[in-house]
């Protein structure tokens, strides 16, 4: 049985996604790629709490959580100098204020996720 190569450092990730099915699939993909899911959040409040209480290396942010912009979470991550990636089903960019940040358009394949994470974590 072939095993996926492990990231140089087993990075810990925060998943911020309001759709439970997408969250589950994303967590499975991350585990398959050798990453650790440090925490999951389904709302802005849960995500902000996770940014304060959880140790992680990178966050994956759904740009739209229950009709609300994920901007407060992105702002908190910038303040703590934590890297993040947007995922969205709406357009090619996560948020206008953060258009320079990587964005994966849903649905995305595991190879695109792997490449994006390696680039952001400097392990590619």
Residue spans for each PLM region:
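Two-component/phosphorelay signaling modules centered on CheY-like receiver
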Residues: 20-39
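Hydrophobic/aromatic residues positioned on beta-strands within the core alpha/beta folds
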Residues: 87-88
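Active-site residues of response regulator receiver
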Residues: 62
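Acidic, metal-coordinating helix/loop segments flanking the phosphotransfer/catalytic sites
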Residues: 40-58
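Short amphipathic alpha-helix used as the core "switch/output" element in two-component signaling
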Residues: 68-82
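A Lys-centered signature of the CheY-like receiver
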Residues: 106
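Non-catalytic signal-transmission and effector/linker regions of two-component phosphorelay proteins
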Residues: 1-12, 109-124
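Conserved acidic carboxylate
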Residues: 17
């Amino acid at each position: 049985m072939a095993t996926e190569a492990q990231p140089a450092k087993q990075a810990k990730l925060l998943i911020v996604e309001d759709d439970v099915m997408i969250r589950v699939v994303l967590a499975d993909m991350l585990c398959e790629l050798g990453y650790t899911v440090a925490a999951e959040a389904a709302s802005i409040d849960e995500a902000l709490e996770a940014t304060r209480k959880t140790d992680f290396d990178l966050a994956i942010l759904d740009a739209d959580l229950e009709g609300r912009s994920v901007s407060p979470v992105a702002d908190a991550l910038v303040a703590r100098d934590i890297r993040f990636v947007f995922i969205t089903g709406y357009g090619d960019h996560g948020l206008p204020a953060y258009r320079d940040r990587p964005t994966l358009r849903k649905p995305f394949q595991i190879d695109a996720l792997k490449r994006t994470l390696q680039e952001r974590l400097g392990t590619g």
